[in-house]
Amino acid sequence: MFCLALRCGCACPWYGERDRLGGLLADRSGLSVQLPVDARRDVVIPPDVDLSDGLSQAEAVRLGMQNNAQFHVLLTDLETFQAAVIEADQVANPQLMTLFPLGVKQWELALRLPIDALWLRSLRVSAANLQSRRVTERLVQDGLNVVRDIRVAYINHAAAQQQLEVARQGAKLRQAIAAVAEARWRAGAISELDASAMRLDALASGQEIVERQGQVSLTRDRLRTAMGTISLAESFDQLQSSTATPPDQLELSTLVEVALAQRPDLGAIQIGVFAAQQVSELSRHNYLTVLGILPDLNGRGLKGLEAGPGLQLNLPIFHQNQGAIARANASWLLAERQLVAARDSVRLEVGQAYTQLQQAQQALTFWQGKMVPVAEKSVGSARRALQEDAVSLLIVLEATRQLQNARQRKVAAWANVQRSIAELERSIGGKLDSLPGKNSDTDVQEYRHERSQSIPNPAGH
């Protein structure tokens, strides 16, 4: 028995949740993800990130997963629950008691071994292991949230740069109109009032450029903060062209089924239910403390030195741990109710993200396919008529403003589509291009079964 207790007490549990977390994040995000090994002091540039040709969205995500400070804070939970697993695996140290032979007292010695750990240790380790895996699943969702935040920051910065370019193009057109108005006023063809209106509009276009430049600076800093690179001198203004395209004919029902099958936070709550069940089972036995006294030595027995085994245990007379059992059962019930509530929240998030994507795609089709071409044609006609002195400058100016507004709305619609895709992929817990067949219920069921295998076995370590 002593050798068995020694073997159990000295065993060290295997803990590979960090590697598992990195693999899950890479699988869900579709990118090679490297997690930091220790506390970050300097910005780390992953070897697969090349900034010489501009920053791509995928490179921004890789930078962020390596350097995002808030994600590093969340990763500390891995070490915390690793310690909890080690602590649960530990067997209490044996107790040595001795009474010295002073006066009439004989010498006694007793070695107490915690033999209750032989049947309680497996329950404790199982519960702690489930809790650590629950944290891993939660951190996968936290990582997907960080990926979404980085993608949105990248999209916002790219959109701000495009809006700045649209403002510059609009300013050139409006300043050209102001120059024509100035020449006509000097020639006496138009009034001072009309010329002043054109001058004011040209000045306003210059101010709009300044405001757009400020917006670029703001989005740049937000992107650098999301990537954890704000301490670098690199501005990250050179962005690679990146446009995500969702699959055709997305089905909301399929998206909801996939989200319920693979969302990491749902998996974390599910594992939490198993862990609460283990804790409830442990509470029914944890109040029994049994110490094996092996050996118990007496210095002066009837036959001299005598030795023999014994037991020391508490008697469950006044209570049988009813309070802890009730608390554990309440935690179990709470975890089950949280799972139901979380599933409803997932359905809501997926539905909202799906609706936002549909609306953004419709807006982009309208502005890009209809309004911008019509506005460009209108400006071209107005400028040709202006050269022939067949149209008022105010009409040309209004057509120019409408073109600039249409281009800005097109950029905003493009950004909304990209943000909606990022949010929808976060909501379903994975990439849209990894969805099962859109019209096959069998594919969806097989997909759910495949994803459910990624949830750890609650009986395993």
Walk through the language-model features, giving the residues of each.
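Short, charged, amphipathic alpha-helical segments
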Residues: 75, 126-129, 192-200, 393-401
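Short segments within alpha-helical structural elements
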Residues: 204-234, 338, 360, 374-430, ...
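Periplasmic alpha-helical coiled-coil/stalk elements that build and connect Gram-negative outer-membrane
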Residues: 137-258, 356, 360, 364, ...
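Terminal intrinsically disordered/low-complexity segments used for targeting and assembly
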Residues: 1-66, 213-258, 425-461
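A glycine-/polar-enriched beta->alpha junction
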Residues: 66-73, 79-94, 109-127, 137-144, ...
